[in-house]
Amino acid sequence: VNNYNDSQKSKFKGIGFGNNHDNTSSYQLASILKAHKIKVVETDGKKFKYFIPLQQKKSKLIKAMFDSQTKFEDSLFYDVSAWTFPLAFNLNYEFLKEKLSGNELFDKRSGKISGFSSYGYLIKPYDYNIPRFINFLQENGIRLKSSSKIFKIKNNYFDYGTLLIPVVGQSKKPEKIFELLTDISKKTGIDVYSLSSGYEDNIGFGSNSFTTIKKPKIGLIVGNGIRSYDAGEIWHLFDTR
């Protein structure tokens, strides 16, 4: 009750964090908050992806997680004393004096594909799950390319590194490619954009503006001289993420 009363006196209405560039990292932080029974609202994403109202019972915990403390009265402190949750996820955040409207977050966001294409598909390169997305397709024999130019399709901007999955020249049939993309899009929360032609905004999707991504061969060194914690962290990343 005291927490709630204190939150009503605050000049801030809540905290905004996250963006539409990296849905996965934004959601991971939101899911941690939900696990602690903190209310999180999913917004339209124009300014921030999520909004945390401060007028709730755990307002002090919320502030502790988002406060950026740089000065300490004591000369001795643990490294966790300076941890700020959103920075651990490389996310922007801001204490806001106005509320952001939206729906309370309940379930994990599922990625979507804009439709079937006979030409190809595009994926923006920002999301934390992009390596997983690429690996899944390469393990299924799908050839991918990466853009060396910025381009636009119907007011939708695509940055350097945008992924292209051409339909022509693949070992899989177009229907199978669409099925695989639909599957990994749902699992990773990454949106897939379907192409309606092979040429847009002065860029040809069969041109040298796109470079084929080679499947990597990765080795993990373990044993004497290697900290088991470091090796385990990388192993877990590759094995589960």
What are the functions of these language-model segments?
Residues 1-241:
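Intrinsic-disorder/low-complexity accessory segments
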